[in-house]
């Protein structure tokens, strides 16, 4: 049986032998793509996922090769790219609104007629979009990936206590917004989603 190197070993070896980086890509591309697709949509998510690995490869000499798992590092790059994409979209929307005199409706007017699940999806998107960027990043990294608090902290280069406090504030605000929107049952389930992840 072939000895498969850890992420750290593969990245360390890839500094001298670039092809050694391939197992890192093979192991993590799909999960990075899924995270980005949920953040920015599948088309842009695919482009950004490729960019994550292009950046990671170019910056591989900076990776702490004593670390066995590259996921926090890769998700950190992905979060930065998703944040940059969101800023680009916001600037584009503002420019379009200015050009059209501010009379632009970005939500589908028929959304109220959609099934309850779709309506709830919009409520959740709205609630999450109202969070501060720092809290939204922590919530989405934790909710859309299998990263522990410690790994989220590593991905965002912040202390684990900051991850816990931002996640707590984000969950509290989303719960309050769900209750205001008439979904107390979902707010209760969201409250129970607060896990005991001490990692």
Task: Tell where the protein language model's regions lie, with residue ranges.
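Internal acidic/polar
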Residues: 4-7, 92-117, 121, 148, ...
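A short, charge-rich alpha-helical start-of-domain segment used by transcription regulators
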Residues: 12-34
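Sigma70-family region 2
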Residues: 15, 38, 51-69, 88-89
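Short helix-capping/turn signature of helix-turn-helix
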Residues: 27-30, 39, 140-148, 157
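Structural recognition of an alpha-helix C-terminal capping motif at a helix-to-coil junction
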Residues: 47-54, 68-80
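Arg/Lys-rich amphipathic alpha helix in sigma70-family domain 2
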Residues: 58-65, 76-98, 117, 169, ...
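C-terminal edge and immediately downstream basic/flexible tail or linker adjoining helix-turn-helix-like DNA-binding
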Residues: 98, 105-106, 126, 154-155, ...
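Helix-turn-helix DNA-binding module
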Residues: 125-137, 145-162, 176
């Amino acid at each position: 049986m072939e000895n498969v190197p850890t992420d750290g070993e593969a990245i360390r070896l890839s500094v001298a032998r670039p092809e050694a980086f391939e197992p890192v890509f093979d192991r993590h591309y799909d999960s990075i793509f899924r995270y980005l697709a949920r953040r920015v949509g599948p088309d842009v998510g695919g482009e950004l996922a490729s960019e994550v690995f292009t950046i990671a490869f170019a910056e591989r000499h900076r990776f702490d090769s004593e670390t066995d798992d590259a996921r926090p590092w890769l998700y950190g790059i992905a979060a930065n790219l998703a944040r940059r994409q969101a800023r680009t979209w916001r600037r584009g929307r503002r420019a379009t609104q200015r050009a059209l005199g501010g009379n632009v409706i970005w939500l589908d007017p028929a959304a109220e007629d959609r099934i309850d699940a779709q309506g709830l999806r919009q409520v959740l998107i709205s609630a999450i979009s109202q969070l501060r960027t720092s809290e939204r990043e922590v919530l989405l990294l934790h909710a859309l990936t299998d990263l522990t608090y410690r790994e989220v902290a590593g991905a965002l280069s912040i202390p684990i206590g900051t991850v816990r406090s931002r996640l707590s504030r984000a969950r509290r605000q989303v719960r309050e917004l769900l209750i205001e929107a008439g979904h107390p049952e979902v707010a209760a389930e969201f409250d129970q989603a607060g896990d005991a992840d001490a990692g």
